[in-house]
């Protein structure tokens, strides 16, 4: 996905990640893990099918014999506006299950909860980034078209919805793993807002995703240690963790401070850049 130069090749490898991720979600072989794995396969396959229809419409709109990114980007300005808009909507909705954006974000949250912590770290970073990159490349394809302002507006709306939904569920959950999963939805919403704003917001969005990857993976791995100590992921049960694992508790606290974008953390800097571009 990261190195593909062709839209169809990127789509194939994103579909492959669905099958690979389902296996690690079912690692514990419990009824809950089985349900989450099947849900992940079904919803992601539905999303990927929607993205495939979007790619077909994109090919029809540009009348390209090749789906190489460079070829499609060169032909996109002459494409039908209706086809391009419909194609982008389908691709955005389809890949939202991978990028953990509204509307198909729920499947990633459930998969993270059922999977072992290292697998959750992979899903919330590597797979989410793959979905984000696929959307970013389509975003770049349409940059020279007449529908690009509309594309940015849609991304801005999706970003705001993802941010709001993630923030609302963050307040309601008492489970550390779900807390981190909804935090991913919130942070990917911020990245989508950066793309929707454009300009320096695009670079801020990429920087935000990279920093989120480093922080979130470390937090999921530390949560695995917490579960070994307490046997669960309940937030209100780990108040004395600093007396049991001082180094781990400091690392967990530091990661949470960075995750909530407390200045001068890198996530604060990326959000500040997006805010400055918004009011510019």
Where are the model-predicted features located?
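Hydrophobic transmembrane alpha-helices and their helix-loop junctions in integral membrane proteins
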Residues: 1-8, 20-280
């Amino acid at each position: 996905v990261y190195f593909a130069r062709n839209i169809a090749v990127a789509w194939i490898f994103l579909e492959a990640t669905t099958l690979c991720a389902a296996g690690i979600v079912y690692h514990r072989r419990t009824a809950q893990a089985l349900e989450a794995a099947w849900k992940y396969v079904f919803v992601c396959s539905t999303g990927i099918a929607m993205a495939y229809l979007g790619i077909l419409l994109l090919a029809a709109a540009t009348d390209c014999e090749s789906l190489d990114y460079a070829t499609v980007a060169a032909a996109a300005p002459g494409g039908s506006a209706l086809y391009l808009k419909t194609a982008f909507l389908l691709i955005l909705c389809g890949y939202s299950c991978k990028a953990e954006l509204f509307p198909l974000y729920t499947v990633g949250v459930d998969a993270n909860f059922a999977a072992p912590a290292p697998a959750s770290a992979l899903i919330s970073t590597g797979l989410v980034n793959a979905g984000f990159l696929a959307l970013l490349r389509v975003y770049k394809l349409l940059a020279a078209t007449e529908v690009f302002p509309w594309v940015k507006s849609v991304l801005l709306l999706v970003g705001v919805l993802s941010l709001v939904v993630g923030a609302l569920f963050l307040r309601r959950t008492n489970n550390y793993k779900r807390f981190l999963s909804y935090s991913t939805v919130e942070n990917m919403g911020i990245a989508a807002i950066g793309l929707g704003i454009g300009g320096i917001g695009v670079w801020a969005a990429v920087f935000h995703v990279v920093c989120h990857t480093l922080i979130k993976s470390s937090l999921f791995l530390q949560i695995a240690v917490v579960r070994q100590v307490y046997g669960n992921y309940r937030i209100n049960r780990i108040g004395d963790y600093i007396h049991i694992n001082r180094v781990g508790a400091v690392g967990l606290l530091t990661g949470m401070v960075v995750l909530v974008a407390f200045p001068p953390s890198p996530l604060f800097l990326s959000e500040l850049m997006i805010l400055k571009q918004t009011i510019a």
